Design a protein with these regions (language model features):
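Terminal, non-catalytic domain-edge segments
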Residues: 192-195, 314, 357, 363-369, ...
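Extended ligand-binding clefts on enzyme/binding-domain cores
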Residues: 192-198, 219-222, 257-261, 269, ...
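N-proximal helix/coil linker or "cap" segments that precede and/or mark the start of modular domains
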Residues: 28-53, 123-127
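Short active-site neighborhood of thiol/selenol oxidoreductases, capturing the structured segment around
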Residues: 66-88
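N-terminal carbohydrate-binding/catalytic regions of secreted carbohydrate-active enzymes
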Residues: 193-263, 368, 378, 408, ...
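Thiol/disulfide oxidoreductase modules built on the thioredoxin-like
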Residues: 131-134, 142-185
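Structural microenvironment flanking redox-active thiols in thiol-disulfide oxidoreductases
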Residues: 88-131, 142-148
Length: 472
């Protein structure tokens, strides 16, 4: 999230990582973590889509109390301390922020104080709120059990719950403007995909149904188009899918096997479009699978196994699966080679494009064939120094591609969903959203900043993640 981080947050992060300055931020061994998300100030023990792991607090009289959620009510919870400059800054903006709540039918906002008994007590925190004229419902985390259970690493941290009490969004930054708060509430209430879709439709989607690689670009991205079609199906957006159906009717093929298979999968999933899917399927078989087998140079990421199943005997599913599985690089770097020469039976051992490799893993995960070694490697990267755009086949980062993109984390999140890895999913979404603009006052609201030249791929990959999230 693109929001302000100041000295208080840096101090808190240093304390949590190095376990120094214990008076400022008491960190137990179980709460301390070296997870990469912590460098972005995210909690380390709170899962998206799950209920709060702990809800035992105290009221201003020291009596047991809980965060209470009414029917159809969304709940903001801000974890804070009276000595924290960033908390003071956020709370000073409440006069501008609170009117935003009135724009929505049923939203409440709790403050939960970090009551360690040293830097803050119920008495000092209550006195601070009274002095500042803050009347939001306030509870107190005596002994820091709430903080430790959620793995909160810095303050303020704001968590947004849906009416079922499940975590929708975590904002570990200082909220200072109505646009930032409104973007958070829109994310939860209107859907995580809402603002991103609006950005894509306004800036990237052509009337024909094709997708621009970037705002203002004249070059299109069939890869993004395939993802967008899949998103349309999963989000039940018929009008958006219709644009893809019309494009296929007018153009026949993207000219790329993987993207054609993605469109086939989308059209096949929608009742009434079976004829369109059959026509596209015939085109795919005739274009790419002469004699019922793979031919020429094949990108492993194009072998969408789930969609190939739809083609029956016309597609060499077994051969494709075998080619992918034999393209496994090895235990030390458990991803897959990028290309296979079907005529020579050899793999290209050159640099690995991580987005392509993760797309291959996603296709394996969709048919239940993902390796545990690969999942473990993804955990290591997501919890370590993050994923990078390209690697050598020895697993070394290519110097000129030593950067992250939101699509890498979107693809990892999709893999995690298919594999049932909730923690990997949460961390991947958090890292993906460090690149997202949360501000309704910005023309870029909902979009993802990326160094990928195909910016649309990042936007549409995130959309697909959001659609899958809503299905869970």
């Amino acid at each position: 999230m693109k929001m302000k981080k100041t000295l208080c947050r840096v101090l808190c992060a240093v304390c949590a990582l190095a376990m120094v300055l214990p008076v400022i931020f008491s960190v137990t061994a179980s709460a301390a973590s070296t997870k990469y998300i912590q460098s972005y100030y995210y909690p380390t023990k709170t899962l998206i889509g799950e209920e709060l792991p702990y809800n035992q607090l105290s009221d201003q009289n020291g009596n047991p109390a809980q965060i209470e959620i009414g029917e159809n009510q969304y709940t903001l919870i801000t974890y804070w301390a009276s000595w924290c400059p960033d908390c003071e800054e956020e709370l000073s903006h409440l006069p501008e922020l609170l009117p935003v709540l009135d724009e929505y039918e049923n939203v409440q906002w709790y403050l939960v104080n970090r009551t360690d008994g040293v830097d803050d007590t119920i008495a000092t925190a209550s006195a601070y709120l009274k002095e500042q004229g803050i009347t939001l419902p306030s509870l107190y985390d005596e002994g820091l059990a709430f903080r430790n259970a959620l793995g909160i690493n810095s303050i303020p941290t704001t968590i947004l719950l849906n009416p079922e009490g499940e975590v929708e969004l975590i904002n570990p930054n200082v909220i200072t403007t109505p646009g930032q708060l409104r973007a958070m509430l829109d994310y939860a209430i209107n859907g995580a995909d809402s603002a991103t879709l609006s950005y894509v439709q306004a800036n990237l989607l052509n009337e024909s149904g094709s997708v621009k690689r970037a705002a203002g670009s004249t070059t299109t991205s069939s890869a993004a188009q395939g993802l967008l079609a899949q998103y349309a199906v999963d989000s039940l957006n018929k009008s958006l899918l219709d644009t893809q159906r019309q494009w296929v009717f007018a153009n026949g093929s993207t000219g790329n096997l993987g993207d054609d298979l993605a469109l086939l999968g989308a059209l096949s999933s929608w009742r009434g479009y079976e004829g369109d899917a059959a026509t596209l399927g015939e085109t795919i078989v005739n274009t790419y699978f002469a004699d019922g087998q793979l031919n020429g140079q094949v990108s492993l990421s194009d072998l969408d196994l789930e969609s190939m199943m739809l083609l029956g005997r016309g597609a060499p599913y077994d051969e494709a699966l075998s080619v992918i599985q034999k393209g496994f690089i090895g235990a030390q770097f458990p991803l897959y080679y990028s290309e296979y020469n079907a005529d020579k039976g050899t793999y290209n051992h050159q640099v690995i494009d991580t987005a392509d490799a993760l797309t291959t893993v996603y296709h394996l995960a969709q048919v239940g064939k993902v390796r545990k070694q690969t999942i473990n490697w993804l955990y290591d990267q997501v919890e370590g120094d993050g994923l990078r755009a390209r690697y050598t086949t020895d697993g070394e980062v290519v110097a000129t591609y030593n950067y992250e993109t939101p699509a890498l984390y979107a693809l990892t999140a999709l893999i995690a969903l298919e594999a049932g890895e909730e923690d990997l999913f949460t961390q991947s979404v958090m890292l993906m959203e460090t690149c997202r603009t949360f501000d309704t006052a910005s023309a870029s609201n909902g979009s993802f900043t990326t160094r990928n030249k195909d910016s649309a791929f990042d936007q549409c990959a995130a959309l697909l993640v959001y659609a899958k999230m809503q299905q869970e």
